[in-house]
Each structure stands twice: as C-alpha cells, then as structure tokens.
C-alpha cells in the first residue's frame, strides 16, 4: 500500500501548528505500540551480532522519561550534548532532548578515535548545560570534561539510568516553526565547526522530502551504519519516526570491518513484502563490492527489494557504482537502486536525488569548457571528456538555483555558478555566528532567467549559499565541486576531484579515493621541491604563484615500490590531461590524509599540514571516519 502523506498537498508541504517529530512518535506509540521501532545490531560481543530491539510503546516511554528528567534540571534554550556510543540509548538521548523542548546537539562518545579536538571545539561553541551518555560511558565522559572549569562543566546524565516512571511527569513541549530543535555541526576540517540551527519545521520537512523522493510505502524498512552525529546518518535514521515502520542500524566500524553485514541486512527477510532503503557515501559502494559479496557457504541473498540507496556526502564515482552493481546484480539488485544525491547540513540534509524509476545518469563534458564554467557534452571517448554524475531532481517544496555570485543573478542551464537554496528545510543560521549566518543564510536573488528554477519561490525569499559549484543540464542538477577547493593555476580553473581522479587512474600505487589535490604559493613549497629536478622550479621568495601539489596514500602492498616511477606517471597523466605541471607528488602511508568527520578528503586541512611540514613527517592528525564498536 502506498504511503499516504497527508502533509503534501499540490506539491507543497504543510504541517499543523506546533508540529514536531515528538508528535509523530507519540502517534506510532498509540497505534503501533507493540510493533518494532528500532533494532540495533550489536557486533561488539558476537561476530554475527546481537539484535537489541525497542518497540514504539517502549521507545515513547523512554523518550518521555529522559525528556521529563531534562525538564526537571534544565531550562528552555539549554543545549543538550549527546556523547553516547551508537546504540539505542543514542536515539533515546536525541529524542529525549526533543521531548524536553531543549536544543539537542548530536555528537559522539569521547572514546571514539580521532575526534577529541573537534569534540572540545564543539562543546566550547555550544556550551551545553547537560551531557547525555550511558552508564558505561559516563566515567570516560566525566574524565573528558574534567579539564573544564567547574562553572563550565555540564551536568552528566546516563540515560539508561533514568527510571521509566519519571515519564509520568513529562509535559508536551511548546514549539513553533522557529524553535531550534538541534544543532547540526558541520564537518569542516580547518575552521572551528559551525552549528547549523535546525528548527522543528526544518526537521520534519526534510524527512518528508526524503520519504517522498524514495516513494516510501507501508512496510518499507530502513537500514544504516552511518554515524548519528553526521547529518546523513541522523536524518536517515529519523525516517522511521515519520514513516512509522522499523529501522535497523549498526555502528560504522561494524560496516567497515565486514561490509557484508550491511548488504545482508538490506536483503529481503522472510515474510517481508516491503522494500528497504539506506544511504551511504561513495567509498562504501566500492568497499562493499570488494569485501561484501557473500561467500559460497553463506545463505543466499535476495536484493530485489532494495528500493533506493542514497549515494551522497562525497563525490560520486561512476566506477564505484558500476562495481557495486556488477557485484550484487546476481543477487537481484536493480540498476535503479543506487541514487546519486546532493545534500548539506545547512539544508538539514537532503536537496536532490535520482528519480526512483531512473538509473544513475552519467554524461561526459569537455574539460576545457568545464574549466571555463560551462557544461558542453561530448562523446565518452573524446580527448577532453570528463565524466559527470547527475545529482538528480530537487526535492518537493524546495528550490535550487545556479547563481553568478558577483551579481546575485540566476544563470541559465549549462553555465556553472554557485548553488543557492530556498525552502522550509533550510536552517536558520549558525549558532552564535551572526555575521557568518547573514552571509550564508540571508541572500536575495536579484534576477531570474526565463523558465527559472526559482519558479514558485517568493520574490523576496531568502536564499542559502551552499559554497558549491553546480549547474542544470537537461533537467538534472550537477555538482561541480566546492568553491573553496577550486584549484586556480595560471588563471585556469581546475576541479580538485578531476585532478585526483586522473592521478589515481595513472597508477596502481595509490589508494582509490585517498588522493588530495590542492595549490600552494610557490614561496611556501618545501625546499625538497626546489631540490627535485622533476619539479622544474627554482626558489624565488617573491613568487606567490599557485603551484599544484598531489598527495596520495599508498595502496596496500606498494610501500616498497620506488617513488620516482609513480611520481612520473602522475605528473605525466596530469600534464597530458589537464595541461598543468605538478610541482610536488607526496606519497604517504594509509590513514595519513586528513578526512572530515563525514569521511570526505579534507583538502584544506591537508594543505595546511603540507605547508607546516607535518604531513611529510607523518605526524598530522587525520579525522578517522569509522567510529563506534
């Protein structure tokens, strides 16, 4: 039976007053109280995992208990930081904060590797009055905050120790469309993280936009391993609260160690009639294709029920999608299952995805024209052909336009500009950063083109600047790259993903997806570059021209291969393909290149570590993506 969405009328999302996810969960507790809400697959003690379940009635009771306790000890407007391991208690903590009417801040257990500096920075920024954690993690959390002054030290509450009986004192919080529900901290790798203020209107709006794009139906089941502190992981797991059916999750580490766990959970279960949906960044598809295919001695899989897996959070590789489909087509996976998508924290999460009945769209455009900010389609075998993956169509009741930032004017299809967004899923600003909020969230589109993509949006509406380059081509949205990551050498634009792809395709010695391309002023290059005759550059203290640097992690089993042939292959491929000289090729060991908390290559952090020498010496501190047990 098709999912009837009473909140979408004539292409517009309309909610009753004071709507929030709390009311949705309470509805399911009343009408489906004895049905499964969430299942956590715990692989920390058993290789095959232990199922830890919670019913809708139990979930409601635990949420009300934690919400009531927070109402007793905190004030409206207080920030509630969630420093839990990824399990059922994390979800109860997040919803408990929503039930209390306070502002949730989804973070992570301080025991997670690679995140300590980020966690301190976020706590400094949001100044929570209370931290929610578990009994097992409470001691570690208290040690983590011990360095803070007594006045700044938040209260620590173990949610699993809150008696369910406390739920009887809970009061339904008052919330309007401008009330902040939670702060979603961005995954930036060089600046102090910014907390996007997501309201009680933004959150259900974006959840509905995702469900509408996935054509959610009665009986559909969600599956995820993504971290809850990341926007894609959080919104994906919250889909169940609106759809009202079960959702299964595991930790990121459980997936990374054995990606077949994710694949097996996506497969049809006995007696199931609905489909499954999920979301993952691009690397996960390659990882699953390489290591997640069932062994001959394992039970058979039926993946014909997989409706859609949103592929987002990092650039989408056509090769990775092909490998994934080829690996799992024998098990019934449909070619339409993988959905290249676009989203960002400032939009709560979701902006666009590939329509359900379409396979991923891959076109080829001319590289020279692309670097001139134009999309010109060419044959796949053309000399300058560059593959571009469509991010699909924009969600219901949301608008995306391509803008010339100098004039704030909409650009016609085929021209590349900054992507601006409008809709009720867009956050209202960055926590405590008024100037930055105004620059990002409060922009006016000064002119529109005929057949504008802003059609239906108010003339005086506020638009959010994404910081991403993109264009429309043949009705689809394409993402060209981050504005701040653009490599400009000798006046020519180069997209870093394009350079990185050429580098990794030129040699088998690099890990796929672990290459960073960026530019550095010539006078900031290390002396080693000027001593290398292959670099073709002499030191001049006044030379500030930007020079290209490629950093790549060595693939497994290649650490003994000689450096020079690898560097020569990379230099030659980029010189031929892009007409630019690589001044330095730095090969580092696996795990060295900085990553953002969402798993993306941290190009700006990599550039900083390169300039200060810590990357070459091997003492940089990359963010570790795989967290949890």
UniProtKB/Swiss-Prot annotation:
One of its GO terms (molecular function) is ATP binding. InterPro entries: AMP-bd_C_sf, AMP-dep_synth/lig_dom, ANL_N_sf, FAAL/FAAC, FAAL_FadD32. Pathway: Lipid metabolism; mycolic acid biosynthesis. Its EC number is 6.2.1.20. Transmembrane segments: none annotated. It catalyses: a long-chain fatty acid + holo-[ACP] + ATP = a long-chain fatty acyl-[ACP] + AMP + diphosphate; dodecanoate + ATP + H(+) = dodecanoyl-AMP + diphosphate; tetradecanoate + ATP + H(+) = tetradecanoyl-AMP + diphosphate. It is an enzyme of class 6 (ligase). GO terms for cellular component: plasma membrane. It comes from the Bacteria. Belongs to the ATP-dependent AMP-binding enzyme family. NCBIfam families: FAAL_FadD32 (NF038339). Involved in the biosynthesis of mycolic acids. Catalyzes the activation of long-chain fatty acids as acyl-adenylates (acyl-AMP), which are then transferred to the phosphopantetheine arm of the polyketide synthase Pks13 for further chain extension. Can use dodecanoate (C12) and tetradecanoate (C14). This is Long-chain-fatty-acid--AMP ligase FadD32. It comes from Mycobacterium marinum (strain ATCC BAA-535 / M).
